[in-house]
């Protein structure tokens, strides 16, 4: 199944999209305000969803109900994950702290040699 998505991209999002998928440049239309309009089809909402969420402040979703629903689900899931403290477990916190300490120790040794 293919999903039709319409996005309004700021300069950063447009540049990153063209770098990763150059063929999309042919589908982009420059708007009067300098942003870009893109209408395309995707085989999965996961990739475009990750792109939109990663650059949410530089992308507007336009007339794409399936993508909007997917994004709302991912945002809700992330909010629940954060509110339940699932994002970093105590064990993970300890591992992160150990890694930071080991990195600092290695940097100190390198600085002293």
Please tell me what each predicted stretch does.
Residues 1-113:
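Polybasic (Lys/Arg-rich)
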């Amino acid at each position: 199944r293919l999903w039709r998505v319409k996005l309004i991209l700021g300069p950063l999002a447009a540049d990153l999209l063209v770098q990763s998928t150059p063929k999309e440049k042919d589908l982009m239309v420059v708007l009067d305000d300098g942003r870009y309009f893109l209408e395309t089809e995707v085989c999965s909402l996961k990739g475009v969803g990750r792109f939109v969420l990663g650059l949410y402040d530089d992308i507007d979703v336009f007339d794409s109900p399936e993508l909007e629903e997917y994004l709302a689900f991912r945002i809700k899931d992330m909010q629940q994950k954060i509110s339940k403290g699932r994002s970093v477990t105590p064990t993970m916190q300890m591992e992160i702290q150990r890694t930071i300490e080991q990195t600092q120790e290695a940097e100190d040794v390198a600085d002293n040699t």
